[in-house]
Amino acid sequence: MASTHSSLTTVQNNANNKSNRTLNTERRLSMESSVFTLYNKAADELDTSQRSAFQACHREFLAEFIGTVILVLLTCGFCAEQTLHIEESKSWLTSSFGSGLSVLIGICVSGHVSGAHLNPAVTIAFCIFSGFPIRKVPSYITAQLLGAFAGAALLYIIIEPAIVQFDGGQRYILGEKSTAGIFGTYPPLYVGIGSAIASEIMGTAMLLLVIMVTGHPNNLPYKSAQGAMIALGITTISLCIGYTSGFSLNPARDFGPRLFTAIAGWGFDVFKVYHYYALVPMFAPILGGLVGLMLMMPFSFLSVRA
């Protein structure tokens, strides 16, 4: 009798457990079904061409935006370390490596979606010489400019107390207490405009050479590490000639943060100092990018996919 009772109890427990598992499974499937039904219903409302258009436009726009936010936030952050007199990190070497690493992280984040241009000079050069669709140029450049502005704004939120501690709440563009250089690029006082223009043109030309060579199909060992090679190239260019211009090589990297400083308290004189130097990092890198790709033409490297 005891054995029979035990067997009945075991069978009943097994049946209850099976029933509970079945109920939990049904509940889970019901929840998943409702979620996926909503998702699929929304997805079905877009036909294939619409989804493709959305992915081709908005995903690339967001990738360029986020990548440029990261690039500018980190690059200007390294500049802040130099400006705010954090002595253990105060050197051009630190700033140069910071620029390279910032670009590398931006490439890692957005490269698989948009190609990680992160730079209007790159986008324009690719459009003219390497078959990048002209219809995408406005979207890319807009994303880059907005991303640069947003990156500067985010950095300001983070380091604003340190800036106040350094300048006493007075926003200086020039002088020992200048903090505008955290965001925009400004050459040393002893450097002429001509030298700064030459530095930006040559630096951007070399940057485009590095991008095109490392991305060429015949350079397989380099293509797999293209982001790292570009970052190393930027670091090297900065160490060699970057100090003469403040080192921009990127119109978005300078214009976005400079515009932010104009709004955030430094005033629109940030566009006028050094005889309207703001025009140099705005246009010289674009010319430099074109020069860089023109130098590649004799070597038939223009088959690189932008």
Curated annotation (Swiss-Prot):
Induction statement: Expression is high at the spore resting stage and further increases about 1.5-fold during spore swelling, up to 90 minutes after induction of germination, followed by a 6.5-fold decrease before and during polar growth.
Per its record, the protein catalyses: H2O(in) = H2O(out)
Q: Name one GO cellular component term.
A: plasma membrane
Q: Which Gene3D superfamilies match?
A: Glycerol uptake facilitator protein
Q: What positions carry the motif NPA 1?
A: 119-121
Tell me, in one coarse class, where this protein mainly resides.
Answer: membrane
PROSITE patterns noted in UniProt: MIP
Compositionally skewed regions (Polar residues) per UniProt: 1-23
Query: Where does the protein end up?
Result: Cell membrane
Ranges spanned by the short sequence motif NPA 2, renumbered to the chain: 250-252
Keyword hit for Repeat = yes
The protein's UniProt keywords, in alphabetical order, are:
Cell membrane, Membrane, Repeat, Transmembrane, Transmembrane helix, Transport
Instruction: Enumerate the residue ranges of region (Disordered).
Output: 1-24
Which residues face the membrane's Extracellular side? Answer: 81-92, 167-192, 248-278
Tell me any Pfam family this protein matches: MIP
Task: Tell me a Gene Ontology molecular-function term this record carries.
Answer: glycerol channel activity
- Family (UniProt): Belongs to the MIP/aquaporin (TC 1.A.8) family.
The domain section of the record reads: Aquaporins contain two tandem repeats each containing three membrane-spanning domains and a pore-forming loop with the signature motif Asn-Pro-Ala (NPA).
Q: Which NCBIfam families match?
A: MIP
Q: What does this protein do?
A: Water channel required to facilitate the transport of water across membranes. Contributes to water uptake of spores during the early stages of spore germination. Aquaporins AQP1 and AQP2 act as extracellular pH sensors and enable the spores to hydrate under favorable conditions and to commence germination. Wounded vegetables and fruit present acidic pH, so the optimal pH range for germination is adapted to the relevant host pH.
Protein name according to UniProt: Aquaporin-1
What organism is recorded for this protein? Answer: Rhizopus delemar (strain RA 99-880 / ATCC MYA-4621 / FGSC 9543 / NRRL 43880)
Q: Which gene encodes it?
A: AQP1
